[in-house]
């Protein structure tokens, strides 16, 4: 397996990252799945057996998809018209057994929207955005109580100064982490050193070589690792490198259940796992395109012990849902109000 990975890597080394490495990642992970199934063992057994049989989950994009795709989600969840609707969503998280959530800069209204840097000077922070973010996080905190963890994902939406101002604004709410995307290790370190809020980053990085400059500076408290982008071989290598620097990892997992299974086996096979991402709000047919259901109980995913990743794709169901260019996401480039 290692030889096959490096054969593919050498063929694409002049086109590092991007679509080339994503293709390698898919092939690499599929090969691990094939080998484990051929041997009749779960994938994690190829690395000496599981370190854990379940992993704690956080409800990701909590409120985000209800703002973006209110007409396309399973169960027709309530709209987010007011801050009370945000509070009710927080209480729903608790009632469904989750002990952690992650949200974006959701602004309730008719329609609800998500603050996103899409045009002009929208990478700049202002008082309206700060007020909207603080109101959102305060409402979630009051709704879920002190024992449920909250994460806020800011993506690439600001420059360093804006990230620092938001970090300062949310310090009173005891976040599990503030999630920030950047390709500048020094800028991320500056943000980390400016706040008491733990910083999570790196979901868009490729290979251990891409992570190394960030780890050397201890520029983040938690490293996000995307298994579908990096592949199983390289994701384990990134986890091992992070462990050398005493940094826990969290799989970046907002895709399908197939990605969830990939991430689950990574969690089973490396020691330094903080928590795992999962999307709860999704399309009604998400469960149908895989042959085995996920086993989620009390906010934990029980890692499957079936051969390989633990399931296969249902090709017939997938064929029922061809991809079409969808409507433009309303991301609210205008200022929050």
Task: Set out the residue ranges of the language-model regions.
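Shared catalytic-loop signature of beta/alpha-barrel
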Residues: 3, 14, 168, 174, ...
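N-terminal amphipathic alpha-helix/helix-capping segment at the start of soluble metabolic enzymes
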Residues: 8, 41-55, 301
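Predominant activation on well-ordered alpha-helical scaffold segments within soluble catalytic domains
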Residues: 24, 28, 32-33, 44, ...
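Conserved, mostly hydrophobic/aromatic
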Residues: 27, 40, 101, 153, ...
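Proline-centered loop/turn at the N-terminus of a beta-strand
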Residues: 42, 56, 149, 198, ...
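Metal-dependent enolase-superfamily TIM-barrel catalytic cores that perform enediolate-based chemistry
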Residues: 54-191
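Extended hydrophobic packing segments that form well-structured cores
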Residues: 309-337
């Amino acid at each position: 397996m290692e030889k096959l990975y490096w054969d593919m890597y050498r063929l694409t080394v002049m086109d590092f990252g991007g679509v080339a490495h994503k293709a390698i990642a898919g092939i690499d992970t599929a090969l691990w799945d094939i080998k484990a199934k051929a041997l009749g063992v779960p994938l994690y057994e190829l690395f000496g057996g599981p370190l854990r049989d379940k992993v704690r989950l956080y409800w990701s994009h909590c409120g985000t998809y209800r703002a973006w795709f209110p007409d396309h989600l399973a169960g027709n969840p309530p709209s987010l018209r007011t801050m009370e609707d945000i509070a009710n969503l927080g209480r729903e998280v608790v009632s469904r057994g989750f002990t952690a959530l992650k949200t974006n800069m959701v602004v309730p209204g008719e329609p609800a929207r998500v603050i996103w840097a899409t045009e002009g000077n929208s990478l700049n922070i202002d008082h309206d955005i700060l007020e909207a973010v603080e109101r959102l996080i305060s409402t979630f905190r009051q709704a879920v109580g002190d024992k449920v963890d909250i994460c806020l994902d800011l993506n690439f939406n600001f420059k360093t100064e804006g990230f620092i101002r938001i970090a300062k604004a949310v310090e009173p709410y005891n976040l599990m982490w503030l999630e920030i995307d950047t390709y500048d290790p020094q800028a991320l370190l500056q943000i980390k050193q400016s706040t008491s809020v733990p910083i999570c980053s790196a979901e868009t990085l490729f290979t251990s070589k891409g992570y190394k400059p960030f780890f050397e500076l201890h520029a983040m408290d938690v490293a996000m690792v995307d298994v579908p982008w990096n592949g199983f071989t390289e994701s384990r290598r990134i986890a091992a490198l992070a462990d050398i620097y005493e940094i826990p990892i969290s799989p970046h997992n907002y895709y399908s259940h197939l990605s969830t299974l990939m991430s689950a086996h990574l969690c089973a096979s490396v020691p330094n796992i903080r928590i795992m991402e999962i999307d709860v709000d999704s399309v009604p047919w998400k469960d149908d395109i895989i042959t085995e259901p996920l086993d989620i109980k009390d906010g934990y995913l029980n890692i499957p012990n079936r051969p390989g990743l633990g399931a296969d794709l249902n090709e017939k169901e997938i064929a029922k849902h061809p991809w079409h260019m969808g409507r433009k996401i309303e991301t609210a480039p205008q200022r929050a109000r």
